[in-house]
C-alpha cells in the first residue's frame, strides 16, 4: 500500500511538470514574459498554460505550431473597463450576485467580457465588448461552453472580412449543426449563420 501511494504521488508530480515542445514554451514566454506559477496541459488538441500575472489567473491556448489561439482571464469586477461597469450598474441585473467574471481574448476577434450572474436559482451570462456594448444575454448557461470560445475558422473569417470589411467578430456557437457567428458591424450587433463554410443568413434587431 505504501508503495502504491508513493507511486501515485510521483505520478502526480510528473503530470504537473509536463511541458510541451520548446517552440510552444518560447511562444508563451514571448507573449507573457511576466507569467508566474505556470502549469501546462493538453486540451482538445491544444497546449494550454495556466498561470498568474499581475495577481490574475489566466489560461492561454496555443496550437501545435506555437501560434497563440486564445486566453481566458478571471477578472475582478473592478478590473472591468469603466464603460462596462457603468452599463452593468444601470441594467436590471445590477442587483444579481456576480459568480464569475471572465475576459476572453482570441486571435482575429475582439475581446469579450463575460459577467456570470445568479439570482434565486437562475443563471445568466452577460457578454460585453470593451466600449460597454452588451452584445449577448444567455440564460440558464451550460458550464461546458469552452469550444464556443475558440476562434472562427480562417475561411469564415475571410468571408466575413470581404462581406463586412469594418465588422468585428465577437462570438460563435454551434447549434444543431450550424455555426452562429456574432459580429459588430457599424455599432450594430448581427448574427451570421453558416453550415460548414457556406453562409446561410444574416439577421439583426431593428429598433
Predicted regions located by residue number:
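Interaction-mediating elements
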Residues: 16-207
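C-terminal motif of bacterial Sec signal peptides marking the signal peptidase cleavage site
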Residues: 8-11
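Sec-dependent N-terminal signal peptides
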Residues: 1-6
